[in-house]
From Swiss-Prot:
InterPro entries: Elong-fact-P_C, NA-bd_OB-fold, Rib_uL2_dom2, Transl_elong_fac_P/YeiP, Transl_elong_KOW-like, Transl_elong_P/YeiP_cen, Transl_elong_P/YeiP_CS, Transl_elongation_fac_P. Keywords: Cytoplasm, Elongation factor, Protein biosynthesis. Disulfide bonds: none annotated. Involved in peptide bond synthesis. Stimulates efficient translation and peptide-bond synthesis on native or reconstituted 70S ribosomes in vitro. Probably functions indirectly by altering the affinity of the ribosome for aminoacyl-tRNA, thus increasing their reactivity as acceptors for peptidyl transferase. GO terms for cellular component: cytoplasm. Its main location: cytoplasm. GO terms for biological process: peptide biosynthetic process. GO terms for molecular function: translation elongation factor activity. It comes from Anoxybacillus flavithermus (strain DSM 21510 / WK1). Transmembrane segments: none annotated. This is Elongation factor P. Belongs to the elongation factor P family. It is found in: Cytoplasm. Pathway: Protein biosynthesis; polypeptide chain elongation.
């Protein structure tokens, strides 16, 4: 059991018979009344996001998640195939279950597959990934310090806002948590 006062982003908990990952949380101490913790949770089975409020000091169960290192192989229709790096066992995950992660997955990329009591519940990406720009407007010559941005389409289909100096063919480092540009690789 873990106290809601000890919540941190990325923590995996068990609430109402489901497995949730803490996305955001905020400790609130109103002037009148008891303190509470407002949290935003992602259901690891369905991908649904729910806001939940807990009383300060309330206890919840910490879910024991096993991470298996796997390699993303390919998409097979609506299924995505991953291979265990040690046993060469292959598993398939439906696109609906890993919708957010698909924007960052490239073939042969190594990721962690999250397992809960023998059930595959999702993909854990690295904090950042390197993706190639396949389409963007050409930069304006000499415009390096204006601080503006333009949209760029990456090799996975993800569209991110990038600085004007980024060109087609550049490899960028992208934050997988919020899908934002970090830097050039």
């Amino acid at each position: 059991m873990i106290s809601v006062n000890d919540f941190r982003t990325g923590l995996t908990i068990e609430v109402d018979g489901d497995i949730w990952r803490v996305i955001e949380f905020q400790h609130v101490k109103p002037g009148k009344g008891a303190a509470f913790v407002r949290s935003k949770l992602r259901n690891l089975r369905t991908g649904a996001i729910q806001e939940k409020t807990f009383r300060a000091g309330e206890k919840v169960s910490k879910a024991q998640i096993d991470n298996r290192k796997m390699q993303y192989l390919y998409a097979n229709g609506d299924q995505h195939v991953f291979m265990d790096m040690e046993s060469y066992e292959q598993i398939e995950l439906p696109a609906k279950q890993i919708e957010h992660e698909l924007k960052f997955l490239k073939e042969n990329m190594e990721v962690f597959i999250m397992m809960y009591q023998g059930e595959t519940i999702g993909v854990e990406l690295p904090n950042t990934v390197e993706l190639k720009v396949v389409e963007t407007e050409p930069g304006i010559k000499g415009d390096t310090a204006s601080g503006g941005s333009k949209p760029a389409t990456l090799e996975t289909g993800l569209v991110v806002q990038v600085p004007f100096f980024v060109n087609e063919g550049d490899v960028l480092i992208i934050n997988t948590t919020d899908g934002t540009y970090v830097s050039r690789a």
